Structures are given as structure tokens and as C-alpha cells.
Amino acid sequence: MGVRKLKPVTNGTRHAVLYDFEEIEKLVRKGKELVLVKKNKVEPEKSLLKWWHRAKGRSRQRGNITARHRGGGHKKLYRIIDFERDKSLVPAKVVSIEYDPFRSARICLLHYADGEKRYIIWPEGLKVGDTVMSISWEDAEAGKPLPEIKPGNAMPLKYIPEGTIIHNIEFMPGKGGQIARAAGTWAQVLGRSTKKGYVLVRMPSGEVRMIHERCMATIGRVGLAEHELVNVGKAGRARWLGWRPHTRGTAMNPVDHPHGGGEGRTRGKHPESPWDGRRRDTRREGVRSTPISLS
């Protein structure tokens, strides 16, 4: 499960490491029986698909480039994902694990007991046929029984034990998960903050932040941790994914990049940003990040 290395029979396959899609599967009803189908036979839930405007790295208003080296790529439909996990105390059965062209992680389709269907990010260890549940802040505060601490269940940070691995974490209550949603990512609950109503969480970057205890989080690590091993192998596959060629700064004009211009080929300078001349290897700390106290 995860990735496979292609035989080096051509230049495009020499270094290619691609997904094997072994985790893709779905329960399909055929007559009176439920049959498990695999890989390319798994089709998405049509009621949860929608057309998505593809900006291709450009502004909607002026059309100028806002994200370089993007554009083209295969046509794709957006899968509507439930990042809020706001359906409280209704059990849901995992019916499928599917590919999502808009993200590195896999997604899984849930069939709730009341008939509703939703997609969520696929956590590592969750299998087709398993049952998951979430609980809202209001129900948890009212003393209703909490779901089990296992992959796929969701609850407010206040009720998640210290040391638990989590993903799909909200920054603001009710806004939906924004942290740790990519393949293989995770965060960890460290404990209560000295500031009332906040929980200390170690981010995927290693930074420790205070997040409000009412914010929802999902138990477990995002699946497909092998994503970091993927090598597309050739430029054409990168174009299928919507990536355009990266132009070197030394090949540009002086108006376009600090490394541009000069007579003939030039050696370049120390790495600089095309916009403000800052060094590329420095990381600016977030000015608006929440200060924390570990004392």
C-alpha cells in the first residue's frame, strides 16, 4: 500500500515513484449483496461533486499572475469535503476510500444512519466497514457520552486526552478544519494552556500554538504518509497535475528578477525573492501568531 517504483525502461520512468492505489476501495450493492470493488472501478458520489472555477494561478479580477508556474492540467470535479464534522452523535459507516484530485490525501465516503452522505479526509488505519462518530461542543458540555478515541472520530479539543495524535483541526470554532489536512500530516495535543479556555497543540511544523478548546479536531493521522516519496518522473506528468515550467531568475530580464540581465550567461547571485529582494532561505515568523506560555 502506498507507492511503487517503476522499472527504468524509459527516461520518463527511470526515477518515477507513483501511487499504487491499493487503498482505493468501495462497497457496492449488486443485487442483495455488498461487493468490495478496488482501484479504477471506484466512482465518486455524484451528489457530492461540483464544478470548480480553476483560477490557473491568476487573479479573477485583473487576470494577472498571482501564483507562478500554475495552469493547464487535467479536468477535474471538486469533491465537497466535510471539514466541520458538525453532525453530532450520528454514527456513520465508511463505505469507500477514494482518490481526490484536489488534494494529496485520500478521502472516504460516510453513510450516516439518517441517510446523509459526506466525504471526510481519510485517517490512517480507518477501513471500509468501520463506524465513526463526532460530537459537538454543546452535546459534550451537556454530559452526553463521548465517542471513542480512535481514528476518524471527531470532538472538541477540550475532550481529547494529552498526547493524542490529531488532524483536521479548526483555528476558530465552527470554521472547519484548517490544520493538518495533507497526506501524512498530524498534530499532537500537549495539554491545557495557562490561558483559560485554550489547549496547547504541536503543529506539523513543530511550532506549539494555543487553540481554543471549542475547536473541533479529528483523531488520528492523515493517511498516505508515503506521499513524500512520490516522484512524478517526467515533466509531462507535472503538466497533467497543473504545474508549468519553473523559469530561472538568471534567464529573465532585470525588470522581472534580481538575477536577471547581464551580457551572455551569468553565474547568478545569492538566492533572492523576485518581489522584494529578501533572501530565499530565511523564514519570517508569523506576525499574527498567538503568543504562548509554557510556564
From Swiss-Prot:
GO cellular component, one term: large ribosomal subunit
PROSITE patterns: RIBOSOMAL_L2
This protein's record includes keyword Nucleotide-binding: no
InterPro entries listed in its UniProt record: NA-bd_OB-fold (IPR012340), Rib_uL2_dom2 (IPR014722), Ribosomal_uL2 (IPR002171), Ribosomal_uL2_bac/org-type (IPR005880), Ribosomal_uL2_C (IPR022669), Ribosomal_uL2_CS (IPR022671), Ribosomal_uL2_dom3 (IPR014726), Ribosomal_uL2_RNA-bd_dom (IPR022666)
Gene Ontology biological process terms in this record: cytoplasmic translation
Gene Ontology molecular functions: rRNA binding; structural constituent of ribosome; transferase activity
SUPFAM superfamilies found in the cross-reference section: Nucleic acid-binding proteins, Translation proteins SH3-like domain
Chain segments annotated as coiled-coil in the UniProt record: none
Pfam families in alphabetical order: Ribosomal_L2 (PF00181), Ribosomal_L2_C (PF03947)
SMART domains named among the record's database cross-references: Ribosomal_L2 (SM01383), Ribosomal_L2_C (SM01382)
Record-linked Gene3D superfamilies: 2.30.30.30, Nucleic acid-binding proteins, Ribosomal protein L2, domain 3
Keyword terms, alphabetized: Ribonucleoprotein, Ribosomal protein, RNA-binding, rRNA-binding
Region described as Disordered: 243-295
Keyword Cell wall biogenesis/degradation: no
Biased composition (Basic and acidic residues): 256-287
Role noted for this protein: One of the primary rRNA binding proteins. Required for association of the 30S and 50S subunits to form the 70S ribosome, for tRNA binding and peptide bond formation. It has been suggested to have peptidyltransferase activity; this is somewhat controversial. Makes several contacts with the 16S rRNA in the 70S ribosome.
Similarity-based family: Belongs to the universal ribosomal protein uL2 family.
Record note on quaternary structure: Part of the 50S ribosomal subunit. Forms a bridge to the 30S subunit in the 70S ribosome.
PANTHER family (UniProt xref): LARGE RIBOSOMAL SUBUNIT PROTEIN UL2M, RIBOSOMAL PROTEIN L2
NCBIfam families in UniProt: rplB_bact
Name of the featured protein: Large ribosomal subunit protein uL2
